[in-house]
């Protein structure tokens, strides 16, 4: 029995949501495909914003918490920012705070590593 396109669409039109769900599952099993994979290309059409997010060149280095070795973290903050002792201590005590803003990726990674080596919890945004 051969189905033409119109007969197939008419049959689909008469199916309930549960029957359509079963049909989709059967197609996934039979042909080894996923319904989620079929939806992905449609989402890629609006990928301009996603591409811009992936190409981010400036990052904020955010100190989440100082950790156990607060003195080392204060020293690291002073090295990264050039702040005085009191300002660096206030920044560390006020965590979460931005240590560095709009830094290039290399500088942000270096600052993050230096702070993490001192015992701080750090995030790049």
UniProtKB/Swiss-Prot annotation:
Keywords linked to the UniProt accession: Ribonucleoprotein, Ribosomal protein
Any one GO molecular function term: mRNA binding
Domain of life (superkingdom): Bacteria
Keyword Ribosomal protein in record: yes
Family matches, as SUPFAM superfamilies: ClpS-like, Ribosomal protein L7/12, oligomerisation (N-terminal) domain
GO biological process, one term: translation
CDD domains per record: Ribosomal_L7_L12
GO CC entries: cytosolic large ribosomal subunit
InterPro entries the record matches: Ribosomal_bL12, Ribosomal_bL12_C, Ribosomal_bL12_C/ClpS-like, Ribosomal_bL12_oligo, Ribosomal_bL12_oligo_N_sf
Family annotation (HAMAP family): Ribosomal_bL12
Family: Belongs to the bacterial ribosomal protein bL12 family.
Quaternary structure and partners: Homodimer. Part of the ribosomal stalk of the 50S ribosomal subunit. Forms a multimeric L10(L12)X complex, where L10 forms an elongated spine to which 2 to 4 L12 dimers bind in a sequential fashion. Binds GTP-bound translation factors.
Described function: Forms part of the ribosomal stalk which helps the ribosome interact with GTP-bound translation factors. Is thus essential for accurate translation.
Name recorded for this polypeptide: Large ribosomal subunit protein bL12
Taxonomic source organism: Polaromonas sp. (strain JS666 / ATCC BAA-500)
């Amino acid at each position: 029995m051969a189905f033409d396109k119109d007969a197939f669409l008419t049959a689909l039109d008469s199916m309930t949501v549960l029957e359509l769900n079963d049909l989709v599952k059967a197609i996934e099993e039979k042909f080894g495909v996923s319904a989620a994979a079929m939806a992905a290309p449609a989402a890629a059409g609006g990928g301009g914003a996603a591409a811009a997010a992936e190409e981010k060149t400036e990052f904020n280095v955010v100190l989440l918490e100082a950790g156990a070795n607060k003195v080392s973290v204060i020293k690291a903050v002073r090295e990264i920012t050039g702040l005085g002792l009191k300002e660096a201590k206030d920044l560390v005590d006020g965590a979460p705070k931005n240590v560095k803003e709009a830094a290039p990726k290399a500088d942000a990674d270096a600052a993050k590593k230096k702070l993490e080596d001192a015992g701080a919890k750090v995030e790049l945004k």
